[in-house]
Amino acid sequence: MTSEYVMELFYNAMKVALIIASPLLLAALISGLIISILQAATQVNEQTLSFIPKIISVLGVISILGPWMLGVMLDYMHNLFNNIILIIK
């Protein structure tokens, strides 16, 4: 197992993690931004008000994109397990 192969494994793991986390982070960012704009417009300065919409939006994204996220993780793990001989060498 060479250092290039280790770096490739690390790169692929980080890429998969970023692909899986991006929709969740984007949903939380957009819902937080919308709630913040509404709070600024109505002058409501309650900091805990944005947590519930963020949680609901993230859970919605998980329920919609959950099978796709699981498929991406399973493809990556399937690839790792198929190439375990190359990793052990």
UniProtKB/Swiss-Prot annotation:
User: Where's it found, cell-wise?
Assistant: Cell membrane; Bacterial flagellum basal body
Q: Which domain of life is it from?
A: Bacteria
How does the record classify its membrane topology? Multi-pass membrane protein
Give the residue spans that cross the bilayer.
18-38, 55-75
The answer, when asked if Repressor is one of the entry's keywords, is: no
Main location per the UniProt record: membrane
Biological processes per GO annotation: bacterial-type flagellum assembly; protein secretion
Please provide one cellular component term from the Gene Ontology annotations of this protein. Answer: plasma membrane
Could you tell me which InterPro entries the record lists for this protein? Bac_export_3, FliQ
Keywords recorded for this protein, A-Z: Bacterial flagellum, Cell membrane, Membrane, Transmembrane, Transmembrane helix
Q: Does the keyword field hold Ribonucleoprotein?
A: no
Q: Which Pfam families does UniProt cross-reference here?
A: Bac_export_3 (PF01313)
Q: Which residues form a coiled coil?
A: none
> Family assignment?
Belongs to the FliQ/MopD/SpaQ family.
The task this protein performs is described as: Role in flagellar biosynthesis.
Question: What protein name does the entry list?
Answer: Flagellar biosynthetic protein FliQ
Originating gene: fliQ
